[in-house]
């Protein structure tokens, strides 16, 4: 029976250290400030942003959500980003994705100053991460790495990543490679997925397909991190057959309550990092 990794508990512990750092910054007259841009009325986006607001308030970060109708033009959004880039009191800028179809997401991401890119999506920050340089790391991959470190040593382990998205799959493999793991990527064109996943000491699944990974695809004693979030018959489930796989793995993250809390916590970490540099 696997250890169930309580992402809420791990995140709460990490936020305590962030609270201390924020208190020290405030004592020096520095108030970490995060600006979040929310466009449209997507329920999931509104839920994520509420979670970010609560976390910021708990830690002592001054957060402000700027809400706009989905009719906002790309130029108006880019002009707003320019203003926030120029505002020395703003440490972190986050534009909640997805954006309306008439707005180019990549152009928006690239417009945010790399120094204030607390999502860790700007190509400059991604490039630094690839090179193993100090930078603002993407929040979900960073959270996954932290969760894994609470369970095992990373160096020398075989990490198999299922999924190759720009937000999770690609960067998380690179973070583990930077920690001296051996990393294998799998995706929709992988010939025999089960053959690959059974080799994993650490299996990270980030596809968005409920029940993709079954117990016969997991090596006994593996650490399994499930990043998928899928709604099935009114409840949230991951990409892993949780009930079956937890009988075989050494540790596993649940959905919900696993990776999600760490994503928001690492966003707070990045905001504090930027404020500390100033």
Swiss-Prot record:
Q: Which CDD domains match?
A: NAD_bind_m-THF_DH_Cyclohyd
Q: In which pathway does it act?
A: One-carbon metabolism; tetrahydrofolate interconversion
Documented EC number(s): 1.5.1.5, 3.5.4.9
Say yes or no: keyword Oxidoreductase present.
yes
Q: Does the keyword Oxidoreductase apply?
A: yes
Q: Which GO terms describe its cellular component?
A: cytosol
Any Gene Ontology biological process: L-histidine biosynthetic process
Binding residue positions for NADP(+): 163-165, 188, 229
What keywords are annotated for this sequence in UniProt?
A: Amino-acid biosynthesis, Histidine biosynthesis, Hydrolase, Methionine biosynthesis, Multifunctional enzyme, NADP, One-carbon metabolism, Oxidoreductase, Purine biosynthesis
What Gene3D superfamilies would the database entry show? Answer: Leucine Dehydrogenase, chain A, domain 1, NAD(P)-binding Rossmann-like Domain
- Alphabetical list of InterPro entries matching this protein: Aminoacid_DH-like_N_sf, NAD(P)-bd_dom_sf, THF_DH/CycHdrlase, THF_DH/CycHdrlase_cat_dom, THF_DH/CycHdrlase_CS, THF_DH/CycHdrlase_NAD-bd_dom
- GO MF entries: methenyltetrahydrofolate cyclohydrolase activity; methylenetetrahydrofolate dehydrogenase (NADP+) activity
Q: Which reaction does it catalyse?
A: (6R)-5,10-methylene-5,6,7,8-tetrahydrofolate + NADP(+) = (6R)-5,10-methenyltetrahydrofolate + NADPH; (6R)-5,10-methenyltetrahydrofolate + H2O = (6R)-10-formyltetrahydrofolate + H(+)
Query: What does the record note on quaternary structure?
Result: Homodimer.
Q: Which PANTHER family match?
A: C-1-TETRAHYDROFOLATE SYNTHASE, CYTOPLASMIC, C-1-TETRAHYDROFOLATE SYNTHASE, CYTOPLASMIC-RELATED
User: Which family is annotated?
Assistant: Belongs to the tetrahydrofolate dehydrogenase/cyclohydrolase family.
| Protein name in the entry | Bifunctional protein FolD
Q: Please give the organism.
A: Exiguobacterium sp. (strain ATCC BAA-1283 / AT1b)
Gene designation: folD
């Amino acid at each position: 029976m696997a250890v169930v990794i309580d992402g809420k508990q791990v995140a709460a512990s990490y936020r305590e250290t962030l609270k201390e750092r924020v208190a020290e910054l405030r004592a020096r007259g520095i108030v970490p400030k995060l600006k979040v841009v929310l466009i449209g009325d997507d329920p999931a986006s509104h839920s994520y942003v509420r979670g970010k607001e609560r976390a910021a308030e708990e830690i002592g970060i001054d957060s402000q959500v700027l809400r706009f109708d989905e009719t906002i033009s790309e130029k108006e959004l880019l002009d707003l980003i320019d203003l926030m880039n120029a505002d020395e009191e703003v440490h972190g800028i986050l534009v909640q994705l997805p954006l309306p179809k008439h707005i180019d997401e990549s152009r928006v991401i690239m417009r945010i100053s790399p120094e204030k890119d607390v999502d860790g999506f700007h190509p400059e920050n991604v490039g630094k991460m690839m090179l193993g340089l100090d930078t603002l790391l993407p929040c979900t991959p960073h959270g996954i790495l932290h969760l894994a470190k609470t369970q095992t040593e990373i160096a020398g382990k075989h990490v198999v990543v299922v999924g190759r998205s720009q937000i999770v799959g690609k960067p998380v493999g690179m973070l583990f490679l930077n920690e001296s793991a051996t990393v294998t990527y799998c995706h929709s064109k992988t010939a025999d997925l089960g053959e690959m996943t059974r080799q994993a000491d650490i299996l990270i699944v980030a596809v968005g397909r409920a029940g993709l990974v079954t117990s016969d695809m997991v090596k006994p004693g593996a650490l399994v991190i499930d990043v998928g979030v899928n709604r099935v018959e009114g409840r949230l489930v991951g990409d892993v057959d949780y009930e079956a796989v937890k009988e075989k793995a050494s540790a596993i993250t649940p959905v919900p309550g696993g990776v999600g809390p760490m994503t928001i916590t690492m966003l707070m970490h990045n905001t504090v990092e930027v404020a500390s540099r100033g």
